[in-house]
A protein has these predicted regions:
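N-terminal non-catalytic structural scaffold regions of very large proteins
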Residues: 1-326
Length: 326
């Protein structure tokens, strides 16, 4: 099923006799109405049948002008009746920017959230935790309302810095996996090439120290030699996997969901390799006290979502619910 021709209409009110007329904001205030606009779409359904492994497409069916919901209209916005004309019962000094729900004027309060698509390194002070430092990133595509995905790279907390392993936590996985196996699943099979993604490549003492720290992580991923073996290894730790699911489906799931939802803001595996190396580089520099840790409470690591992103996210959630019901 495809959704086409999305249209947002003007606010209308329907009387008891069936007559509809354009609603003004003041009318919605006086009559305790909600100042809403209808969302109308066309549904295009296509049926496919499988004939001995050959997919055959049957005729398409288009259902036009389907009402799927309503959305609050902000006063003086593009879809508001005051956008074109100022009615006599409206104040000319009212700049709008609010909605009217059941006759009451409502505003949407901006919400604070952590920044997306920027890696941050924090120290884990919990004594029971086996990882001392974590590089965390919350990713989402730009101008997209899909659910943010969290990925982390962690280092164990042994006293000797050269006896620690690096592990990665990915979306849809129930357990961390070795760092170098992730690199190999993304297409980088040579250990030297992987190290070059991580270090500064300036021949400094810091590069030498980072390579020594990576030594155990290199050994941990040495049993995996091909990209397929790396993906097969990751498929063993899929969330909610059942014993009835075939290995082929698990491998397909890793390719289409696990690796795709890792660093979702990046377009391809090559850019993910570079960015993963950057995350490891930052984690190890914080671990070695070369650069400071990030401050969770600093406003440079936060963003404020105003009404546009908040309404967009809510609309996306409601639309997903509709598609699942269909």
């Amino acid at each position: 099923i495809n959704v086409n021709n999305v249209n947002i209409g003007k606010p209308f009110t329907t009387e008891n006799n069936g007559y509809s007329n354009l609603m003004t904001p003041n009318e919605s205030r006086l009559r305790n109405y909600s100042y809403l606009a209808s969302i109308i779409v066309d549904f295009e359904s296509t049926i496919y049948i499988n004939d001995n492994g050959v997919e055959i497409e049957l005729d398409k069916k288009i259902i036009k002008n389907i009402l799927i919901g309503s959305i609050p209209i902000l006063l003086r916005s593009k879809y508001c009746t005051l956008n074109d004309t100022l009615y006599n019962d409206e104040c000319e000094y009212d700049y709008g920017g609010y909605s009217i729900i059941n006759g009451n004027e409502k505003v949407i309060i901006s919400q604070e959230r952590k920044v997306y698509n920027i890696p941050q390194v924090f120290e884990n002070n919990k004594p029971s935790c086996k990882y001392s430092y974590v590089c965390e990133i919350t990713t989402v595509k730009e101008n997209d309302y899909y659910m943010p995905r969290i990925s982390t790279i962690k280092i164990t907390k042994k006293q000797n810095i050269y006896e620690n392993h690096l592990r990665v936590s990915l979306p849809h996985l129930k357990q961390e996996i070795p760092l170098f196996i992730l690199f190999k699943a993304l297409g980088s099979l040579n250990d030297k090439e992987i190290i070059n993604y991580i270090i500064d490549n300036d021949g400094s003492k810091l590069d030498t120290q980072i390579i020594k720290i990576l030594h155990l992580s290199i050994e941990e991923g040495s049993s995996i030699e091909t990209e397929f073996e790396a993906i097969e290894y990751i498929s063993k730790y899929i969330n909610n996997s059942t014993y009835n699911v075939s290995d082929e489906k698990k491998i397909k799931y890793v390719k289409e969901h696990v690796l795709k939802d890792y660093l979702t803001h990046l377009p391809n595996d090559l850019s993910k390799l570079f960015f993963t190396g950057h995350m490891v580089n930052k984690l190890l520099k914080c671990y070695l006290r070369v650069i400071p840790f990030d401050d969770r409470d600093s406003y440079k690591n936060k963003r404020i979502d105003c009404i546009g992103p908040l309404l967009g996210s809510l609309t996306h959630q409601c639309f997903n619910k509709i598609t699942k019901d269909i």
